[in-house]
From Swiss-Prot:
Gene Ontology terms, MF aspect: calcium ion binding
Claim: Disulfide bond is one of the keywords in the record: yes
Modification 3',4'-dihydroxyphenylalanine occurs at: 23, 31, 36, 43
Disulfide bonds: 49-60, 54-69, 71-80, 86-97, 91-106, 108-117, 122-133, 127-143, 145-154, 159-170, 164-180, 182-191, 196-207, 201-217, 219-228, 233-244, 238-254, 256-265, 270-281, 275-290, 292-301, 306-317, 311-328, 330-339, 346-357, 351-366, 368-377, 387-399, 393-408, 410-419, 429-440, 434-449, 451-460
Domain of life: Eukaryota
Protein name: Adhesive plaque matrix protein 2
Domain EGF-like, residue spans: 45-81, 82-117, 118-154, 155-191, 192-228, 229-265, 266-301, 302-340, 342-378, 383-420, 425-461
Phylogenetic classification of the source organism: Eukaryota, Metazoa, Spiralia, Lophotrochozoa, Mollusca
Major subcellular site: secreted
Known tissue expression: Produced by the byssal gland.
Residues bearing glycans: 93
Modification comment: Contains L-DOPA (3',4'-dihydroxyphenylalanine).
InterPro entries: EGF-like_Ca-bd_dom (IPR001881), EGF-like_dom (IPR000742), EGF-type_Asp/Asn_hydroxyl_site (IPR000152)
Species assigned in the record: Mytilus galloprovincialis (Mediterranean mussel)
């Protein structure tokens, strides 16, 4: 054990050396530690950082056979023995520090000044009235004013004293310094102008000026024009001695002399009289009314209410004061305002023995009760009608009685005397033989086409002039 310690001590002295020159920490460090290359040995070399060569808390890192110092706190040099005057940076307000020998110099910016750039041209703020200070160059500044203030330090207010005349209101303007808002009637940069002085309106018109430097004239009744220079009654528009006066709304009215009318008294509506048949003309200003004598009517009494006779069927016409101007006295049973309604012959009950009377407006017919016949149902029927008594036609067949015999007209699908036999005969209308909207009707052994208006022929295929009667075949 003692032998090993001796060998270690000998190796330490050999590797590190004992005659290292001394150095002053305040001087430039030119010392370079030697690089030792010991001969191969079975013993490991000693770490060069064990003697802590790095000053002021520098961190030592071995590098091959030597070491390297990583300095802290503004120190530099191979062994961190030299001091950097700019670390830490003592210059204020983000200014740049420049080392000068063992001391330093501050390069100021943004309006800062002083040894450490600790002062600023905008602190305290030299701008008055809430003006905003901005550094200008190294030692200068610029004030951005607000609220209508101007001047190098915002010490002057643009609206004090008020430059606006005639009760105009002053408002600060960032472009021109101020702006005037004039009351009605005044205009100009300082509200010094009034368009109504002197008054440009003639004939007692009232002038009203606006804030834009323009004016308008309110004219007295009867006067008009941009400056009330014209009069509605000059020259006089009323004819035939009519008197002109203003209507109060920019126009005129004419007071006409007797017998004349119209807007300018040019018309005498009753001369010559427009009323005929001794009717009396009444002047209504620009119009007239005719008062007609009895029996005449119309706007000019030119119509005789009874000529031509409005009463029909030999009725007699009499003038009266009704809305129509006449009244009809009907004869022969006719009725209505103009005797147009014919008498109903059924009112006299011409059908006897329970017969029913039917009137179509032209003639009447009697539908007799069973057992009676004739025009007025006065003749007895000696042979009973089997169509009524026994109803011989079956299956919706139609019974036809001619007074002597009957026959059955069977419905489609049935045949025989009494329509009791089924018939498989094809319906002739199934093929739609009738053209142009014609209506097909089965007639037992054939069919009949009832043509629409304007067509004719068996199949309604022929065009024909319009007729009130439809053709059947």
């Amino acid at each position: 054990m003692l032998f090993s310690f001796f060998l270690l001590l000998t190796c330490t002295q050999l590797c590190l050396g004992t005659n290292r020159p001394d150095y002053n920490d305040d001087e430039e460090d030119d010392y370079k530690p030697p690089v030792y290359k010991p001969s191969p040995s079975k013993y490991r070399p000693v770490n060069p950082c064990l003697k802590k060569p790095c000053k002021y808390n520098g961190v030592c890192k071995p590098r091959g056979g030597s070491y390297k110092c990583f300095c802290k706190g503004g120190y530099y040099g191979y062994n961190c023995n030299l001091k950097n005057a700019c670390k830490p940076n003592q210059c204020k307000n983000k200014s740049r520090c420049v080392p000068v020998g063992k001391t330093f110099k501050c390069v100021c910016r943004n309006g800062n000044f002083g040894r450490l750039c600790e002062k600023n041209v905008c602190s305290p703020n030299p701008c008055k009235n809430n003006g905003k200070c901005s550094p200008l160059g190294k030692t200068g500044y610029k004030c951005t004013c607000s609220g209508g203030y101007t001047g190098p330090r915002c010490e002057v207010h643009a609206c004090k004293p008020n430059p606006c005349k005639n009760k105009g209101r002053c408002f600060p303007d960032g472009k021109t310094g101020y702006k005037c808002r004039c009351v009605d009637g005044y205009s100009g940069p300082t509200c010094q102008e009034n368009a109504c002085k002197p008054n440009p309106c003639s004939n007692g018109g009232t002038c009203s000026a606006d804030k834009f430097g323009d004016y308008s004239c309110e004219c007295r009744p009867g006067y008009f024009g941009p400056e009330c220079e014209r009069y509605v009654c000059a020259p006089n528009p009323c004819k035939n001695g009519g008197i002109c006066s203003s209507d109060g709304s920019g126009g005129y009215r004419c007071r006409c002399k007797g017998g004349y009318s119209g807007p300018t008294c040019k018309v005498n509506v009753c001369k010559p009289t427009p009323c005929k048949n001794s009717g009396r003309c009444v002047n209504k200003g620009s119009s007239y009314n005719c008062i007609c004598k009895g029996g005449y009517s119309g706007p000019t009494c030119g119509e005789n209410v009874c000529k031509p006779n409005p009463c029909q069927n030999r009725g007699r016409c009499y003038p009266d004061n009704s809305d129509d101007g006449f009244k009809c006295r009907c004869v022969g049973g006719y009725k209505g305002p103009t005797c147009e309604d014919k008498p109903n012959p059924c009112n006299t009950k011409p059908c006897k023995n329970g017969g029913k009377c039917n009137y179509n407006g032209k003639i009447y017919t009697c539908k007799c009760a069973y057992g009676w016949r004739g025009r007025h149902c006065t003749d007895k029927a000696y042979k009973p009608n089997p169509c009524v008594v026994s109803k011989p036609c079956k299956n919706r067949g139609k019974c036809i009685w001619n007074g002597k015999a009957y026959r059955c007209k069977c419905a489609y699908g049935y045949g025989g005397r009494h329509c009791t036999k089924k018939s498989y005969k094809k319906n002739p209308c199934a093929s739609r033989p009738c053209k142009n909207r014609g209506k097909c009707t089965d007639k037992g052994n054939g069919y009949v086409c009832k043509c629409a208006r304007g067509y004719s022929g068996r199949y309604c295929s022929l065009k024909s002039p319009p007729s009130y009667d439809d053709d059947e075949y």
